[in-house]
A protein has these predicted regions:
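Non-ligating segments of multi-cofactor redox enzymes
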Residues: 1-412
Length: 412
């Protein structure tokens, strides 16, 4: 195993493959405070890519209800348990540094399969059968499902809670599926970092299914090969006719009704770190505002999917899922500064990928306090630009308010 630097855990770690990095990296941000669990993203993906025989259980995009839901069932809890068995009580953060074992480091210590390069497991058929299991099931007193606290709650954290977690392949910087494949059938595209399967080389050993910590590599029994999310790469290449040759967001992003999704491409330096691109919305949300956090960064794959954590969920649960930056992310989101509030308006305003934004300052609307902190709202205008530098759209922080005229009072 070689040594690679993983900025999400703030240290070098062991990885079975040689280190290589793409020129740009596909990345996305999901705002979990907005998700309504409508599954429109899920069906947009399903109707585009996985509607054929043998793909019945394939949901490349899924939306599960946390803390009890999961697809496949218990995918995260089972891996967390495996890691704790290998490294009892050692899976801890010290500030921004993860001092426990990643799935690659734990595989070396695991006393099970000596040939295992990545710690993981194969889900059972039963665990794949119910993508919406425990949908809308809240946490009640003492963790009992579907019950409610009779004595009320104290905000901002709720005693009775659940939230929707939308998931696709994270197109990781250090993919577990790629590291585990004995056929070298999995690779990252050099132009955008999308993780793909060469189906001519795949022999269906399912090592990738076992190794992916997020369980987004899926075996198709009719063809006996692995299939997975391809990040709608023809759209990234600008081949969708509706995009006029410009890179477009994926089907699941474009269909999002709750406006929770923003997708982009970030420039990557030779050492694997993100190149500074101050006015790329991805770079701003992840590296500057730091409101968007990776999903289970302690697994060690450096996922390129980022989440704005739900503000009503107990902090310890969120820290286990998104790492030590949760408190700062939620505080920044609840009392956003002028630039962050403007950038948040760009979610789902267009299907084209935003490569750069510009803010034109507008008038002050009002001042108030949020949780004891001063907040000022400005009606700024934010302008989004595509890869060619052309303007995609411009929108304002304060959305227009329309009053229905009397002659249309009863119309729908």
């Amino acid at each position: 195993m070689g040594q690679v630097y993983n900025w999400q855990i703030n240290r070098k770690m062991e990885y079975p493959n040689e280190e290589h990095h793409p020129q740009s990296q596909f990345a996305f941000v999901f705002n979990l405070n907005r998700c309504i669990g409508c599954q429109t993203c899920t069906m947009a993906c399903k109707s585009t890519w996985t509607f054929s025989k043998g793909q019945e259980y394939m949901w490349w995009n899924n939306v599960e209800t946390k803390p009890y839901g999961g697809y496949p069932q218990h995918w995260d809890v089972k891996l967390l348990q495996l890691l704790n068995q290998v490294n009892p009580n050692g899976q801890k953060w010290n500030g921004a540094t993860f001092e426990g074992m990643t799935i690659f480091e734990a595989a070396k210590k695991n006393i099970g399969d000596a040939s295992q390069r990545v710690l993981g497991y194969l889900p059972t058929d039963e665990e794949w059968r119910a993508p919406n299991i425990y949908e809308d099931s809240p946490v009640g007193p003492e963790g009992v499902k579907n019950t409610f606290h009779k004595d009320g709650v104290t905000l901002p954290e709720h005693k009775t809670w659940f939230f929707y977690l939308a998931r696709i392949c994270n197109h990781c910087t250090y993919p577990g599926c790629l590291a585990a494949c004995p056929r070298n059938a999995i690779y990252k595209r050099p132009e955008d970092g999308v993780v793909l399967v060469d189906q001519q080389r795949c022999r269906g050993y399912r090592k990738c299914v076992e190794a992916c910590p997020y369980k987004k590599a899926m075996y198709r029994p009719t063809t006996r090969v692995t299939e997975k999310c391809i990040a709608c790469y023809p759209r990234l290449e600008g081949k969708d006719p509706s995009g006029n040759g410009q890179p477009m967001e994926t089907r699941c992003m474009s269909a999002c009704i709750g406006q929770i999704r923003l997708q982009g491409l970030v420039k990557i330096k030779d050492d694997g770190n993100w190149a500074e691109d101050r006015y790329n919305p991805m770079y701003y949300l992840v590296k500057v505002a730091k409101v968007a956090l990776p999903l289970y960064p302690q697994f060690g794959t450096e996922p390129n999917g980022y989440y704005i954590p739900p503000r009503w969920v107990p902090r310890q649960f969120l820290k286990q899922m998104f790492g030590p930056g949760v408190d700062q992310a939620i505080e920044s989101y609840m009392v956003p500064d002028r630039e962050l509030l403007a950038v948040l308006q760009m979610f789902r305003r267009s299907n084209q990928i935003i490569f750069r934004y510009e803010i034109q300052e507008g008038p002050k609307v009002f001042e108030t306090q949020i949780h004891g902190k001063p907040f000022t709202l400005y009606n700024d205008t934010i302008i989004a630009y595509n890869k060619a530098g052309g303007e995609i759209f411009r929108t304002q922080v304060e959305e227009p308010f329309y009053v229905r005229p009397d002659k249309h009072q009863n119309s729908i």
